[in-house]
Amino acid sequence: MSRLLLIVLLACSIASAIGVVYMRHMHRKLFVQLSKLEHSRDELNIEFGRLQLEQATWAESNRVDQVSRERIGMKFPETSDIVVIRP
């Protein structure tokens, strides 16, 4: 009886040790994946900041005014061309 109990306890101990090793392996694997994802997130945040700066540059009113004058030939209307419409 005690020999059977010893064998059962030894088997449980080995199973527990294998479980600990497996969980540590999974922890390391997930930590590496997390590190890669954090690096990717940081790179995307940097790119997002650059894109926001670029968008702000292209959306400046003087830039829009310059492009509309050069490419489309737009201009501000003369005072005689302005018509005020009231309801």
Curated annotation (Swiss-Prot):
Cellular component annotations (GO), alphabetically ordered: cell division site; plasma membrane
Periplasmic face residues: 24-87
Membrane-spanning segments: 4-23
Membrane topology summary: Single-pass type II membrane protein
Keyword Secreted attributed: no
Side Cytoplasmic, residues: 1-3
Alphabetized InterPro entries for the sequence: Cell_div_FtsL
Keyword Cell membrane set for record: yes
One Pfam family named in its UniProt record: FtsL
Major subcellular location class: membrane
Keywords, alphabetical: Cell cycle, Cell division, Cell inner membrane, Cell membrane, Membrane, Transmembrane, Transmembrane helix
GO BP, one annotated term: FtsZ-dependent cytokinesis
Compartments, as annotated in UniProt: Cell inner membrane
Quaternary structure (record): Part of a complex composed of FtsB, FtsL and FtsQ.
NCBIfam families assigned: ftsL_broad
Cross-referenced PANTHER family: CELL DIVISION PROTEIN FTSL
Main function: Essential cell division protein. May link together the upstream cell division proteins, which are predominantly cytoplasmic, with the downstream cell division proteins, which are predominantly periplasmic.
Family membership: Belongs to the FtsL family.
Name listed for the protein in its UniProt record: Cell division protein FtsL
Primary gene name: ftsL
